[in-house]
Structure formats: structure tokens, C-alpha cells
Amino acid sequence: MLQTSKGSNSSSTSSSRSASISTATPNTIVEDEELLCDPKSELTPPAVANPLRPVSKSNTSVEDDSKPSFTYDLDVFNLCKEYLNTRNHHGLALIARQKGIPPILRFKVWPILLKSHPFVISPFIQPDSELLNESTSSRSNSSSSSTGSNTPLSTAPGSIKDAAIIDGDANDNDNDSNSNSNDDDNDRDDNDANTKEKEEDERNNKIREKIKRDLAKYIQRLKYSQSKYTVSETEHEILSILENAIMKFTLKWGKIIKYDSSLTWIALNLAEWFPPIPKTPWVLVGKEYSSSHQSLIVNFLDDYSNYIDNIPDLREYLERLIYHDEKISTISFREVYERLVLVLLHCPQPVSRRKKSDNQGSNQRRNQSEVQKDQQSFKVNKTTLPKTGGTIEERVSYFIYCLRKLIPELSQYFHEEQILTKFGCLDDEWLIWWLKFCGTKVWSKYDRGRIWDFMLGWRLKNPKRDFNYYYEKLNYVNRNTLEKLGPDIFWSVGNEEEDISGDNNVDANANEINNTEKTETGKLVKREGDIKRSSFKDLVNELSNELHISKRVSTDEVATSTSSPATTKMASSSSTSSTLTPNVSIPFSRVDPHVALIFISLSLLKSKENILVELDQHEIRQFLSRLPSKSYKYNQKRSTRQKRTSYASNASSTSNSPMGQSPVDRDEDSIFPTSRIVISNDSKDQKHKVNFIDNIISEAGELWRKWLWSEMVEDN
């Protein structure tokens, strides 16, 4: 543990400020005998520059080679700015799940998305089994102690004395003895209260020490080459804010989940995108960042300076958001952190637990038979899990099942290497970090940020709302811009027939009628005289019918309805003589976000398959526990080959493809910086870079449809 000051007291007034990574003053050399590499070394790190100094464009310590590759459609970016300025959570959620939030806007968008997220409005976290056992045993002990005593005692003042007065045989001596007894009871109650308070303080102090130790591990990861290191004033303040946020969450939700290092890692990963100190641009650097002075913090605008400089007035807009915003979002780090944990750790309430709470009087034999029946009907669970989600145990089982089905070669190799045969702190904990904690700690911050965008933007369609309601909520977004967002990533078969269902609004009743007609005519479900219906076809129909809502809209109406001048000009220039255009579709989420995360994880494994089959058991676990990112540029030695690939891709790509499109030359960008559809963060020497994590998410949708189709075939 990091050393603490000997003179520090445990008073409540000083604990809030001293609750930091170390009680040593800022810029003091801190040494950790357990965590640091060489405690006896006298190596002193170079002095850390004042982090509050504005970063100069020409004097930045971040080289171009360390900047993440990032491309983003300009029309979608402007639409995101419009929704952000108006706090339109409907539009921001749509962009987040379809294309991701621009990283430079996440610090303002994420709080808005979290405030309206369904898992924050109706939270449920799977309780820890140990805490459930403790609460059950405590209740049983309290009930046994109360029933075992023949004379129930009341702790209310004067209760025993009042009982003596009611008794006609009471005398003065009895009253004196009763008063003494009452005083003894009060003293005993005070002692019990003090004992409980001390025990609670000891528990909280232990939790706080664990938080400090986990924060120290993060520092040691970044400053591994130094046995002694300095913590600047700003770094000290950030770590203190993180510690207090984690501690307050643990105190609030401690009866449901106990403290785990994952809570600290969620806070650390959030602080890589959301500045903990209000009105500052300083975030944690993350494990990929390479800095000459090895500072813990960085200005989050530095990574995307190339992108920012390609858009006029964007830097001034971002600086206003950082330093002067009082309207869009002023939520604190602690509140954002609590809501983020509720989303990442959310799970649906188990059916067995709901039945148990509803029918507490049912006998134990019936409950056991229901549990055995649920365990035997895994086929039914496969048809409900994609929509409802499940516990972490169910998701792990589902992941292994899908891995064997979709990536059999890698699954066989994992079986041979015994990768998925045992779980524990030192075994296959990587899978728990992937699925339960949503990539916390083990994924790259750039990949994790995009996936968290997807999860925070997850929204279901309200079947009681029609197209006009949502189209109005989106501020009548331009059709061309809406088309760039594309369909839901996890769309399923049968959407084509739904797209041309008619000119009227598609509501829930119309969907149900269309589904019935299609089922009876055999267009979607071919019964072929068989009375037995396909459960997976039912799942497909249910997902397809509520996947999106659409409406045929005239070109003139769409072109004039948008509030963005740039998108209006584009729509008017592309209008044709026809009065009607194809359907305007608004995609909605249908697959549970944690189930979608399973297919994203499978897609990540598939992309690393060639590497994994060359590694042994230990190397695989280590690799998957610190999954490298492809968001950074290739090495300079590959730049020549990459240029040739970029030019070839540029010749074959179309101007309407935002994904994988090669940017144009730098000189043209400097003359007409806003004429491009896609703005890139790449430097001049390395122009083309595939958006790795976007391709991973798209491939996850393909794996989802492949799994669904294979299950439908087997179900027949």
C-alpha cells in the first residue's frame, strides 16, 4: 500500500479530503514496497510539468504516430452537435448505438444518455451470493433469538417502568430497581450502537484501503519503470475524486454487491473519457498512451487534434463546452459513475426469484422441480435470452455455446488448451471481465469507448408510439443523414417485407396483423401443414416486426424539415422529380445489450483467431486479459505498404461510403476542409486506416444472424 501520514486522524471532516491515493502532499515522492518494481532504487522520476498549462499545438508531447485512427462522417457529426446543444437524448441515443459518439463529445453526451437509460430508470443488479447468505443467516439468527426468549425486552425509554406502574403490586423499591434497570439497558444499547459503529467504520476503512490499493495498481501499470514516482496536484485531486465516488457507491449499494476491484476499474476507465475535475480537459491516459514524462493525465483533445483542426471553429466550440458550459451538462463524476455501473452491471431479475417473491408460501419441492425444469429447457432459454438478457452465469454458458457453434476451430483449440474449462481469479477471469464488466480493464480504451457508446445508446421502441412521434423527437432529421446511420446492427431476417408494408405508419397493431397474415400465407413461416410452430421463427418475427418504424415521406418534406443548413443543402441538391422517396426508417434496439456484447466478444475473438492458435494456454490468457487495440497507427516501417493499400482503396471506393473510405489529399483538405463527407484524424503520412472496432461491431451483427439462421434450420 502507499504510505500514509502518521499524523493523519480518522475524523469524518478530514476523511473526505484525505481519501486519496496517498495522504502525502502533491509532488511528494511516493514509494510502494509491494507494488513497485525495485523499492531500494533511488531513481527519481523527472518533474511533472504543471498539468493546468494549456497544451500548445506545436509543442504537444503526443506524436502523430501515437494518435488513434479515427474517421467520422461530417453530417453525422453536425447532427450530433445539434442534438447535444438541445439535449435531445433520443437523437444522441440513436447516433450512439448506430455510429458511436465522437470521442471528443463523450464527456457531455454520456451524462445525457445515462440519465435517460432504461437500466438507470429501472435498475437491477444481480446480488452477490455471499451477501444473500449473510442477510439470510442474520435474519434467521434474529428470529431465533427473538423466539427463544420467553420475556421480550423493549428498548424504549421508560417501558419497564411503565409496566411496573400498571402492575398494582408495584412499590417504590420496585420503581427504583426498574429505573436502574432502564438505565442499564440504555447504557447497554449505547454500547451496542458504539460497537456497531466501530465495526462499520472498520469495514469502511478496509474497503477504502482496497480502493487505494487498486488505484495504486493502475499507477504502477503506467509508471512500471519507476520505483519512485511523483503525483502532481491535479493527478492527486483526480484520484481523490475517483476514490470518493467508488466509496460512496459502495456504501449506497453495499447491501446488494460487495466491493470488488471491478468497481475501481470502471471508475478508472470512465475517467479516461470523462474529466473528473469539472471544467477541465484532463482525463486518465489509459494503458495505450506513451508519454515521455509518464504523466497519469492528458488533455483529451490532444488525441484528436488532427480531426479538430480539419473542421473550422470546432476547437473553439469544444473549449466553450469544457470551460464555460452551464446548460448542457454539469453532472458530477460521482453521479455519472453510479449510473454507468448500473448500466454495465445490470441484469434482469431471475424468473425463479420473481416467482419465489410472489409465491412465498409455495413448498420447497415445487421450487426444486421448477429449477430442474428450467435447467432442462435450455432450448427455450436460447429463444428468450436475446431479448430479455440473463445472469452472468447464463451469459457465460451462452457465450461458450455460441463459440462452439460459430467458431468451431477456435473453440476446439480452446478446448485442447483448457481455456474455458475452469474459472477463478487466476484462471479464465478474462471472460468475466469481457462479459460481466463489459471490457473494463482488459480492452483498449478506444475499443471500449465505442462499445460503451453502443450500450449507452441502447433503447427499445415503445409500441404505443408511432412514427410521427419519434420523427418529431429526432427534430425531423434529414433522410440522407438518417440513411447514413443504417439499420440496427443486430437486425434479423424478414425486414425487407416489413420495409414495404405500406405508406401508412407502422404501429404495433399493424405489425401484429401483418405478422398474422404472413404466417398464414407462409411468406415468413412455412408451416407446410405442420401444426408445430418454430420457436426461433417466432423470435425472428418478433424481432423483425418491432425492429424499426418507417414511413414514406416526400423528398421536399424531408429536405425542408431539417434544421441543419448543411444537410438541407445536400438534400435539396440530391432531390429528384419523383414526389415520393423510399421509406425513412428509424432503427431501434431489439437484442439485449449484454447479449449483443456476447457477439461483439465473439467477433473480437474471431479477429484474433490467427494469433490465438499460435499461443499456448498461459499466453492466451495473458493476451485476452490485455487485449491490444488496432486503433493506433501501424509502425512507420509499414507506412509505404499502407500508402499503396490506401491509394488502391481510394480508386475502388465510392463517395457515399463512410466506412473504410480513403481520405483525400491533405492539400485539398486545407483548401476545402468541409467539402469531404468523412473527416479523418490520420496524419499526412498515414492517410488510410480501417475503423477496427466499427468493423468488429458490424461482424458481430453478422455472427448474430448466422447463429439465428443455424438455430432456425436445426429447429426445423
From Swiss-Prot:
Task: Specify residue ranges for compositional bias: Basic residues.
Answer: 635-644
Location of the Rab-GAP TBC domain: 100-459
Q: Where is this region: Disordered?
A: 1-66, 132-205, 352-376, 502-521, 554-582, 634-669
Which organism is this protein's natural source? Candida albicans (strain SC5314 / ATCC MYA-2876)
Q: What is the lineage of its organism?
A: Eukaryota, Fungi, Dikarya, Ascomycota, Saccharomycotina
Localization, UniProt:
Cytoplasm
List the keywords (alphabetical). Answer: Cytoplasm
The cellular component terms of Gene Ontology attached to this UniProt record, alphabetical and capped at eight, are: cytoplasm
Q: Where is the composition biased (Low complexity)?
A: 1-25, 132-168, 503-514, 559-581, 645-657
Name the gene for this chain. Answer: OCA5
Tell me which PROSITE patterns the record gives: TBC_RABGAP
Q: What is its main location?
A: cytoplasm
Gene3D superfamilies recorded for this chain? Ypt/Rab-GAP domain of gyp1p, domain 3
Keyword Acetylation in record: no
Q: Which family does it belong to?
A: Belongs to the OCA5 family.
Q: Where is the composition biased (Basic and acidic residues)?
A: 191-205
Protein name in UniProt = Oxidant-induced cell-cycle arrest protein 5
